[in-house]
């Protein structure tokens, strides 16, 4: 029967020419299979906000479409690639209470043939608590599929004495593809200056169905920030903003925890940020320290962001950090918003950074 140990042996025999980093990639894959799975941590959480909390659906724009690409551990053969497409819509109906969203996410590892595809539908309800404070509550229902492509491996019993490959393996390949349903919820309390986000993903802890019936553990998060304006944008079409926004967050999933704190500075049309992350991994691995550098550009309804994770610890530095690129198309009618403001029917503009 195939287990994580034989999987490592298969990878090692199949790619004996790798340098040490290649074997490390295989060990990481085997660890991921034999331990509870983890969700990807995006370095531009406000660009990928629907992934972080369904209550962000419809919070920033009348509608938006965002494409995110993340290449993690680029120094390893194949690395770990995440591609995400997110879209949300807040219909212009009386009260503007409702918003809908769609989230498509794919994780894959080129070294091990591992892929995980998740498709989610989101709904958020928005309401004003006072003239200056509003609340958004959201729900997320996702369908996921996880699989391993065995044609990426060469097992020991396939290697003849002269080093050639001979026939299929006799290993029992029992990591069948797994389908699962995941439920999540969240809330965002916000004003035009600050926000507090609370979210829980995978509340039903779906089984991933691999050999040990491992579960996808709950992801719990709490984050927030406050924006200080030097130049505050007006209600018209032509606006200019100069501001700085300190942010902080706590995240926990399975045996992994993460805390972070950072600062974003916006001088229209450019946003720059730096976020420190302290990550505690399961299995007795030492704390990993990262510094995330973010740079974004806004031009009309287009947003383009790039970030790089700089490893401050030995392991994270050896793995090469992560590159992340986001491209967003969004629409927000400032004139209509000004009209609603005059009639006291407007919500506060959420002050979260764009990236």
Language model feature labels by segment:
Residues 1-39, 332-355:
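Cleavable N-terminal export/targeting peptides
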Residues 38-355:
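Subset of outer-membrane beta-barrel
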């Amino acid at each position: 029967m195939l287990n994580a140990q034989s999987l490592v042996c298969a990878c090692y025999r199949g790619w004996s020419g790798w340098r040490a980093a290649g074997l490390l990639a295989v060990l990481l894959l085997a660890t991921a299979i034999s331990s509870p799975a983890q969700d990807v941590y995006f370095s531009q959480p406000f660009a990928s906000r629907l992934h972080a909390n369904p209550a962000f659906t419809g919070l920033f724009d009348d509608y938006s479409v965002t494409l995110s690409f993340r290449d993690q551990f680029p120094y390893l053969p194949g690395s770990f690639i995440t591609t995400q497409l997110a879209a949300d819509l807040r219909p212009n109906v009386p009260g503007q209470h409702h918003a809908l969203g769609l989230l498509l996410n794919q994780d894959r590892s080129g070294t091990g043939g591992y892929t995980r595809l998740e498709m989610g539908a989101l709904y958020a309800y928005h309401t004003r608590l006072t003239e200056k404070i509003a609340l958004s509550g959201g729900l997320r229902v996702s369908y996921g599929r996880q699989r391993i492509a065995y044609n990426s491996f060469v097992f020991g019993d396939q290697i003849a004495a002269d080093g050639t490959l001979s026939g299929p393996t006799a290993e029992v390949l029992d990591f069948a593809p797994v389908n699962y349903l995941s439920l999540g919820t969240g809330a965002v309390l916000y004003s035009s200056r600050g926000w507090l986000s609370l979210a829980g993903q995978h509340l039903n802890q779906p089984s991933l169905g691999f050999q040990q019936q491992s579960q996808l553990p709950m992801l719990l998060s709490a984050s927030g920030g406050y924006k200080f304006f030097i130049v505050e944008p007006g209600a018209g079409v032509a606006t200019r903003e100069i501001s700085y926004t300190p942010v902080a967050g706590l995240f926990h999933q399975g045996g992994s925890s993460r805390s972070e704190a950072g600062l974003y500075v916006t001088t229209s049309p450019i946003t720059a940020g730096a976020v420190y992350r302290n990550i505690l991994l399961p299995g007795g691995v030492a704390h990993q320290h990262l510094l995330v550098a973010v740079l974004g550009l806004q031009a009309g309804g287009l947003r383009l962001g790039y970030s790089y994770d700089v490893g401050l610890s030995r392991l994270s530095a050896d793995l090469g950090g992560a590159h992340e690129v986001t491209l967003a198309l969004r629409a927000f009618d400032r004139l209509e918003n000004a009209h609603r403001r005059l009639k006291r029917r407007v919500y506060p503009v959420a002050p979260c950074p764009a990236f």
